[in-house]
Amino acid sequence: MAVKIRLKRMGSKKAPFYRVVVADSRSPRDGRFIEEIGYYNPVAQPAVVKIDTDKAVQWILNGAAPTDTVRNLLSKEGVMAKVHETKYGK
């Protein structure tokens, strides 16, 4: 089972917000997911990102692959640096 960390679209038409979820890569974008690890609201000024860093690091170390957009969000939150530090040391 290939697991990805990706965005699940929520909200109304023209006013989206997203949940950052861990899901099987074969499931639909807004379908079944394994765990919710945060959210992203691009409509708010400034955009709001809240991610549980411990869960995100654990999933990435266990082999979950973040999508490009989620990878950028994780980098801005400092999660990717934490993963690199945990995996390879300082």
UniProtKB/Swiss-Prot annotation:
Transmembrane parts of this sequence: none
Cited Gene3D superfamilies: 3.30.1320.10
GO molecular function: structural constituent of ribosome
GO biological processes: translation
InterPro entries linked to this entry: Ribosomal_bS16 (IPR000307), Ribosomal_bS16_dom_sf (IPR023803)
GO CC, alphabetical: cytoplasm; small ribosomal subunit
Keywords of the record: Ribonucleoprotein, Ribosomal protein
Family per similarity comment: Belongs to the bacterial ribosomal protein bS16 family.
Protein's name according to its UniProt entry: Small ribosomal subunit protein bS16
Protein source organism: Brevibacillus brevis (strain 47 / JCM 6285 / NBRC 100599)
